[in-house]
Amino acid sequence: MSEPTKRKLHVAIITSGGAGMFCGACMHDNTWTRAMMKQGAEATLIPTYTPIRVDEQNMTGSQVFLGGINVYLNYRSRLWRRIPPFFKHWLDTPWIINLATKFGVSNDAHELGALTVTLLEGEQGPELKEIEELARFVGNELQPDIVCLSNALLSGTIKTIREHFSGPLFCVLQGDDVFLEELGEPYRGRSLELIRQNVQQLDGVLVHSDYYRDFMSRYLDLPRDHFQKVLLGIDLEGHDGTPTENPDEPFTIGFFARLCKEKGLHNVVQAFEIFHKKYPDSRLSVGGFLGKENEAYFQKTTKRLAARGDSYKYWGSPASLAEKVAFYKSLSVLSVPTVYQEPKGLFVLEAMANGVPVVQPAHGAFPELIEKTEGGLLVPPGDPRALADAWERLYLDREYRLKLARQGYERVRQFYSAELMATESLQFFQTRVDAAGFVKNEPQLTPDP
């Protein structure tokens, strides 16, 4: 008699849209979802607040839960909260939300303090009906084996989801502290207090680096054994750049990330001014999403590059994967010298995947990535001169630059593919589902009479 076929593992990931911008966390969630499906699992990506924007196949459904417009109106108006959900659902339509984001709906942390607190209050706050709708969908309709929140800012939903879903519930941390630290008081303190309370109800917290596990263990006051490190990975399809050395092409330094102060664009500009004085044939290329709240910073930071003439090029925000890959392929080296301590570093993996070495600050997750891939150099954080010196080393020693490029190119494929990420995470999830099922169905022992 043949063994019964084992049911596919079903993982539900609840992600947050980035209000019209390319968001590293939701792009990672999208890649993760698709990779698990390719491995034969069932995976559902559930968008909240706004639709997600990605440069690959979008894996989310058409319904947006906790729609940003309704969440904001619930926060602002008691009358609006009393309106039956049936009459409000049209505002959760993706094209309506996307239209609203074009007219100045902001995701700037300074403006979202009070709203963040109300969401973290969960069923005690004004978003109860929206949270209940999400929880009923997950627990009653979808009925997955695993639920994974994409960030701790969604932790206000945990208690209500628990009322409808009894399986393992996790949360991935992908830079939540960066958002929280930008909130003004009293919102920062209250938000952190609520998150610390909410995450106690989780079965575990997932992170992508040892650094972030140790940091968030202290930050959230959670024991380290409550954390699980899961592999960070990228979909390598379409990343067709290769390690090359063309002496006829100018040495081009690249910056690719959200164009804001915390990503360290000003550090790159200062370092390039130092470097370009010595090597005037060099080039600087800048690309990434520019939000309205960062336009003044961007203009002020790049204004000083006008004197460099054609040595500086602004690519804007590539609208497709092909455009992004074309940007990487034009570079000799990538540097995103973040001010904050980066928990992931997807842009590092993307650059290496296209044969481009990196020079990064020696903090956050970067040392782990550089150590494992040997695809770049580390410099002291916040030191433009050290950054320029590292570029100079690669400029003068093209063979060494090519060696780093080859090592990064090969080891990203060896250690950081989406396939490997899906395989390892599904193995972990399966063990937790099996353990939960064993405990649930284990016969109760009775004491001897």
Residue ranges of predicted features:
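Carbohydrate-associated surface elements
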Residues: Y211, G233
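A conserved catalytic-core segment of Leloir-type glycosyltransferases
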Residues: P47-E133
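Conserved donor-binding/catalytic core segment of Leloir-type glycosyltransferases
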Residues: E245-K263, V269-F272, S285
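Nucleotide-activated donor-binding/catalytic signature segment of Leloir-type glycosyltransferases, i.e.
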Residues: F298-A322
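Glycosyltransferase donor-sugar binding loop
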Residues: R283-Q299, Y314
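Acidic donor-binding loop of glycosyltransferase active sites
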Residues: A326-P343, V356
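A short, well-ordered alpha-helix in the C-terminal region of glycosyltransferases
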Residues: A386, R393, Y400-Q414, M421-Q427, ...
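Conserved acidic donor-binding segment of nucleotide-sugar-dependent glycosyltransferases
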Residues: K372-T373, L377-P384, R393-R398
